[in-house]
Every structure is written in C-alpha cells, then in structure tokens.
UniProtKB/Swiss-Prot annotation:
Membrane-topology annotation of the record: Peripheral membrane protein
MF (Gene Ontology): kinase binding; SUMO-specific endopeptidase activity
Full protein name: Ubiquitin-like-specific protease ESD4
Record region (Disordered): 43-66
Species this chain originates from: Arabidopsis thaliana (Mouse-ear cress)
Reactions performed catalytically: Hydrolysis of the alpha-linked peptide bond in the sequence Gly-Gly-|-Ala-Thr-Tyr at the C-terminal end of the small ubiquitin-like modifier (SUMO) propeptide, Smt3, leading to the mature form of the protein. A second reaction involves the cleavage of an epsilon-linked peptide bond between the C-terminal glycine of the mature SUMO and the lysine epsilon-amino group of the target protein
Gene that encodes the chain: ESD4
Outcome after substituting residue 448 to S: Loss of protease activity
EC number(s) stated in the UniProt entry for this protein: 3.4.22.68
C-alpha cells in the first residue's frame, strides 16, 4: 500500500520524489539504480477545493508538474574506487578512453589532409561528397597553410601542415572536384614526421655509399689477385704430380668358362624327376652318394645341402693336389666341423682333436696358407677363413653379417691345434680379425650356400672376389656338372 498522510491526502514529498526521478541526469546510465517507487492511490489524493472533472484521467494528468529539461552537461561514466592500503585509487579509465578516441580522430584527419596535397583540379575527378563540406581550406599557393575543422563538440582546432613537395593542391574549396596525380607520392606522404636529410636517396647519403664502396673495391682487388695467384700455384702442383693410371681389373677366364651344349644337357637330365632315386655320383674318399634328389638343391631357388657342399670341397682339395703350383695350399673343413668344435655345451677341442692328425691328412694345419671353415647358422651359410700367411681371421657373410664369437673360437682352436700337433705356441688371439664388407652379396634368400662355395673357390685360386649375383645361375649349373663328373676345374 502507498504511504498516506493522516488526513488521507498525499504528502508533497511523493510529488517531489517523482519530479526528482524524471530530472535525474544519471537515470539513463547503466550503473544507475532506481530506488523503489512509492505506491499510492490517486482516488485518495483529490483536492477538495477543486471541482471534479468529468474525465478523471485528464484531471489527474493535468495535476502533474511539467517536465523540465536537464541541464546540458558532459556525461560522466561511473567510477569505482579501488582500495589499496586504505587509499582509493584515482579513476582515470574514462579519461584514457576519451584521449584514445581523440588521438585516433586526429591521426585519421592528419592522414586525410596530407593526402589532399597531391590533389589537383582536372577533368578526371573524384567527388568527395558531404565529407568535404565539413572542411574549409584556404590556400593561395602550392602549399597548404592551415585547416579549420568544426567537430560535433563545438571545438575548433587548427593544424599546421608541412609544405608539399609539388604543386599538389592549388585551390581547394567547398564542393570542387579533384584529381589524384600520383598515388605513390600520396602513400609516401602519409608519414608526417619524415626527415628528408636522413633519406637514403639523398645526395649526401649517396656520396657516403660511394666512398664506402670505393674503400671495399681496393680490398676486393687484392683478394682477387690472391685468388688468381693461388689457382695458378695449384695448377702447377697438379701438373708436377705423376698421373696415376688406374689398373684395370682383369677378370680371369677359367672361373667363367661357359658350359657346352652337351654339358648343359647332361645337367638337365640329372635334374629330371626320373633320376630322383638314382645314384648319379659316388665320392669314394668321403663316402658320399649323390642321388638325383640330393642334386636337386642346385636347381634355381633351392637351398644347398651338406652332401653337395662337402663333396664340392673334397673336389677342390683334389684339384689342388693335381696342380699344387697353380692353387694355394689350403685345408677344407666339412660342414660338421664347427658344430663339433662349438656345441651347445661350449668350446670343446677334444671333440675334433682326431680330425687333423698327421696320419689322416699328411700335413699340419699350421703349414697351410688358408683354412676354410663353413658355418651353418640354421637357415644361412657363412664362411670363416684362417689366413696363416697374413696372420688374419676373416669372416665372410653374403648378407654382411658379423659374429665375433666364431672368430674367437677359431683363434683358440689354432692355439690348441699348434700346441697339440706341432708343439708350437701360437697366440692367434693377437691376430687381426676382419669382417669383410667389400664382397659380393646376395640379392635373394636362397643363394647364400652358392656364395659361400664361390668365396672358397676364388680364394683357393688366389683371386679376388670378382663375381656377383648375376653369375649364380651359371655357378649352379657348373657345380652340378663338376659333381656329376667328380672333378673341379
């Protein structure tokens, strides 16, 4: 219910409160909080001294006081004091915002006026429209002296401009047409605080650049002379050196003698399925029978087996015996030697001590130039070589693998073998151990056994390993032919 006086009439304070609300200039502010309105009844506030009107609504509205226009004053934003150490911080956010927009306005106006220096009257024109009407520029010559701008706040500002570098503006008045002479000059003139003396294109700066370049020219000439002199000295040194003639590697003919038609026909008949159970060759010294099924390992894409490898190594030893001057003195261990020497229980010299007796071989191992040891590693064949002539231990893998344990075991074996058979002490552990890298390598997964046999064949001839993967099909046919005839060529 509204507040009512004792005599059932409204007090004058209620009307004063309404009048204050309508005239409060901060009413439209977002931070303004209006107090709660007083509620009262118009029916109880009628004056008894005045006659009642026929239209009660009009009579009630006429009793309200006329709204008074608020005083024209600058609008201030609300401020909030930030208490710090008991003191309120001065609020200058409104002032900063006002200064920010003023600066933006001044910068835009200055840029626009600077661009007008390069505007002339002409046939080709750009209509500036209503924006030109707000400016009044008076100029009697090619330079702009002053500009008077009237803004919405009734403030007048006068800006002095620098004289232009060309007759860009002759007479600019309200409503006239303009033509832009050079847009590049207009863009360059947007910087009002340029210093012409510091411009790199000025004559003084150009002279300084020329002087510094002349100083460098003398140094560059001296360096150029030294370069030419050193090039001549280098050419004289190259001419004085003896020319090195590259030695042409001669590929021997014997390891690559092609098979005749009869020899190829003989090999293909042995590979036929009719001879799988037939014994095609028997090596008496090693007591190994070569059947058609065993010989099938020399067909393309097949893995070599122990019988073929061991028979071929026996044939290489017999070839050396026939022509000892043509081939190196070598010993060829079979594929079971290393498995006996190094088993699952470890190194065991006693397991192979009887393999190399003087009575069985007719010579001592320390008298051989090379000793070949085939190594079978489950699904891959590799080769270890004991080179007595050069006191080296070599390991050859067609897949470029390494295994130091194999060479260490063979070094220990050579020491035990020399002490057991000859009574000599040999420290093979001090020999060079080399894992040969520059050697022919296989390009598939089934020619490792063939590569191993050819390593042995070429080393026993005293030749380098001058073959490749392309020769493997030929070597398979040739090895089959030599096994069938029990003679290695």
């Amino acid at each position: 219910m509204g507040a009512v006086a004792i005599n059932r009439k409204r007090s004058d304070e209620s009307f004063n409160f309404i009048n204050q609300q309508s005239t409060n200039p901060l009413r439209n502010s977002p931070y303004f909080q209006a107090s709660k309105k007083r509620r009262f009844s118009f029916a109880m506030s009628e004056d008894s001294g005045k006659p009642a009107s026929s239209n009660p609504t009009i009579s009630r509205i006429s009793r309200y006081p006329d709204a008074k226009a608020p005083l024209r004053r600058e609008i201030h934003a609300p401020s909030r004091g930030i208490l710090r150490y008991g003191k309120a911080k001065s609020n200058d956010y409104c002032e900063k915002d006002a200064n920010f927009f003023v600066r933006k306005y001044d910068d835009a106006k200055r840029s626009a006026l600077e661009a007008l220096r390069f505007v002339n009257k002409g046939k080709d024109f750009v209509d500036l429209g209503d924006e030109v009407e707000k400016e009044e520029v008076v100029s009697d010559d090619s330079s702009v002296q002053a500009i008077e701008v009237i803004d919405c706040d009734d403030d007048e500002e006068k800006k002095n401009l620098q004289p232009s570098f060309s007759s860009g503006v002759t007479d600019v008045k309200k409503g006239e047409n303009f033509r832009v002479e050079d847009t590049s000059m207009m863009l360059d003139s947007l910087s009002l605080d340029r210093d012409v003396d510091n411009d790199a294109s000025s004559l003084e700066a150009y002279r300084k650049l020329m002087q510094s370049a002349e100083k460098r020219n003398s140094k560059l000439e001296a360096l150029g002379f030294e370069i030419v002199l050193n090039e001549k000295k280098l050419s004289l040194l190259r001419q004085s050196r003896p020319k090195t003639v590259e030695k042409r590697v001669e590929v021997p003919r014997e390891p690559f003698i092609p098979l005749t038609e009869d020899e190829e026909a003989e090999v293909y008949r042995a590979f036929s399925g009719r001879n799988r159970r037939k014994v095609l060759a028997t090596h008496e010294n090693s007591n190994i029978d070569i059947t058609g099924e065993v010989l099938q390992c020399l067909t393309p894409s097949a893995w070599l087996n122990d019988e073929v490898i061991n028979v071929y190594l026996e044939l290489l030893k017999e070839r050396e015996t026939r022509e000892p001057k043509k081939y190196l003195k070598c010993h060829y261990f079979n594929t079971f030697f290393y498995k006996k020497l190094v088993s699952d229980s470890g190194y065991n010299f006693k397991a192979v001590r009887r393999w190399t007796t003087q009575r069985k071989l007719g010579y001592a191992l320390i008298d051989c130039d090379m000793i070949f040891v085939p190594i079978h590693r489950g699904v891959h064949w590799t080769l270890a070589v004991i080179n007595n002539r050069e006191s080296k231990l070599l390991y050859l893998d067609s897949l470029n693998g390494v295994d130091p344990m194999i060479l260490n075991a063979l070094a220990k074996y050579m020491g035990d073998e020399a002490n057991e058979k000859s009574g000599k002490k040999i420290d093979a552990n001090s020999w060079d151990m080399e894992f040969v890298e520059d050697l022919p390598q296989q390009k598939n997964g089934y020619d490792c056994g063939m590569f191993m046999l050819k390593y042995i064949d070429f080393f026993s001839r005293g030749l380098g390993l001058c073959f490749s993967q392309e020769h493997m099909p030929y070597f398979r046919l040739r090895t089959a032919k030599e096994i069938l005839r029990l003679r290695a060529d």
